[in-house]
From Swiss-Prot:
Pathway: Carotenoid biosynthesis; staphyloxanthin biosynthesis; staphyloxanthin from farnesyl diphosphate: step 5/5. Its EC number is 2.3.1.-. It is found in: Cell membrane. It comes from Staphylococcus aureus (strain NCTC 8325 / PS 47). The gene is crtO. Its main location: membrane. This is Glycosyl-4,4'-diaponeurosporenoate acyltransferase.
Length: 165
């Protein structure tokens, strides 16, 4: 019984830790000016093996589950609400590309706090590593899947000269 209480207490504190840390990271991430995401940083580059996002769908079937991921705007009003995308024009697509970069960065950073559990009991460490991965990696994959497709759409719109709706 004493051991069970200890596990429940540990689970509660771990849950509170993740809630506070991830909400703060997301909040700070939304404050990064868009101009930083307009730069061409290597982390956001689509690599050859990704084949413009096709890799992610071939190996992880992204199209089948990406719509089931909770929209971050529901938890944090500062996060871009994709439902406001009423028209497809270059300005909106550029904003969506910026937001895929922002979301990817936020979720990479959100994995890092797992380091605090490094010295903890093995079970606690493994559970928290699992949580950090399962809560963040799917969102990173979706961003890496969507961004090349949005970039291609942006190229097409710019070629056609469709600047505004």
């Amino acid at each position: 019984m004493k051991t069970m209480k200890k596990y429940i207490k540990t689970a509660f504190f771990c849950s509170m830790y993740w809630l506070i840390v991830q909400l703060n990271i997301a909040n700070l991430g939304t404050r990064i000016p868009d101009k930083y995401f307009r730069q061409k940083y290597i982390i956001f580059k689509s690599f050859n093996f990704e084949k413009h996002g096709k890799f992610w769908n071939k190996w992880f079937y992204v199209r089948k589950w990406k719509h089931k991921i909770l929209d971050g705007h529901q938890l944090n009003q500062n996060i871009y609400d994709q439902r406001h995308l009423m028209t497809i024009n270059t300005d909106e697509i550029e904003k969506m590309i910026i937001e895929t970069k922002r979301a990817e960065l936020i979720h990479w950073i959100s994995i890092l706090p797992v380091i605090i559990f490094n010295k903890g009991p093995r079970l606690v460490k493994y559970i928290n590593i699992f949580y950090a991965m399962i809560a963040n990696v799917p969102i990173i994959i979706v961003q890496r899947y969507n961004r090349p497709r949005l970039t291609q759409l942006l190229r097409i719109l710019k070629r056609r000269g469709e600047r505004h709706d």
